[in-house]
Amino acid sequence: LCLSKVNDEVNHDYIMGLSTFFEKRNWNLFVYATCTDLFWNTPEDRGESAVFSLINYDITDAVIILDEKIKSTVIIDSIVRKCSEKNTPVIFAGGMPKGHYSLEFDYEEGFAEVIRHVIDDHGVTDLHMIAGIKGNDFSESRIAVFKKVLSEKGIEFSDNMVSYGDFWSVPTETAVNKLIDEDRLPEAFICANDTMAVTVCGVLADNNVRVPEDIIVTGFDGVEAIKFSVPKITSCLCSYDDMARETAALLDKLFGGDMTDSRVLITPRLLPSESCGCHCTEPINTSLYLNEVNNRYYRFQEESFALNKIAARIQMCLNIEEVAQKFNRAQYFYNMVCVLTPECIDESIDPAKHCEKKYAEDKLYQLFNTDVDNAYKPRAFDRNEIFPQIKWVMDKKIPLIFFAINFMDNPMGYVCFHFN
């Protein structure tokens, strides 16, 4: 799996889903990730992208690219080209490139379901859409769906039934306040995403307009924030757990030779809730959720402090062995292996002069391994292993998550996490 930002909630859900469905099939998941989406092509981006050169296509049955999360077509094309050379199938999750397998959310049908729910189940015919950015593909597509459903229901469309909120709060506030000033409030606001729907509810509340008693409001995407808004927002969930399930099913067919359609559409789930007058079907324990958020924040603070402290200690080390021992005494490192290239181990070599190799050497060096006793010293291992004690981890069917270690555009090694 190739993607960026594993800490992003959507990406995390997808990895967790794949891990669950793959484990049932006795498959292994290797995740190659970057911290940024690689859009700007900075030296740091180029250094991070070296992680994708770690992929061993000789032992890879399929490559999944979450292409909405990798913004560099150069990097994606490079991965696809190498897959093609090895006859390794490529699956695009979230995209539709020609000549490859793809899984996509049927955004149009999901958005149409929201509009039909408002018209059919709540009897509303006076609707106003808060679209995204004018000219944006997603925004224009949802406007087209809005027009289509209105036509289906015999409701005449006019251009003044659409305002633009640019997918975020401030332009949405401006758009709704303009409608209030012009005394043009509709019976229902259909918003192109959840952020704008939450904002609409806030502006209406500030003007003593009740939701849903006076005006219905709906969103789209199913983000976490809608569970805590007042009222809770009716939306449509693009579930990455569903995406993971369908990915595994597609691979079943692919490996079994039963693949007939290269494109899989996943219909988002309608989530009726309070902002349209329905009951919330997914109540949430806010105190438990807040406790989890607080724990994440405190952990983030503690680990940031620990990273800064060990970075300062490393600056005082005289050799690579001392560096390894500093990690041995760092309590916040676990379930991970740190690997360096030979250039980083050999003090006579300037690593910057060998950056073009990108892990091409036959040998790599384990700097430390948090789950093996006495493993806090450099140790050579074969490049094809990619991970010392790899069989032990693979037998557990735990996803391996790789990140490049780089300084600017110079790849110096990588870390591999194997969280249970």
Where are these regions (language model features)?
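Short linear interaction motifs
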Residues: 46, 320-321, 386, 396-398
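Acidic/polar, low-complexity linker and loop regions
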Residues: 302, 379, 404-408
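Short beta-strand-to-loop transition segments that serve as allosteric relay/switch motifs
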Residues: 408, 413-420
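Allosteric regulatory "coupling" segments in signal-transduction proteins
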Residues: 346-381, 388-390
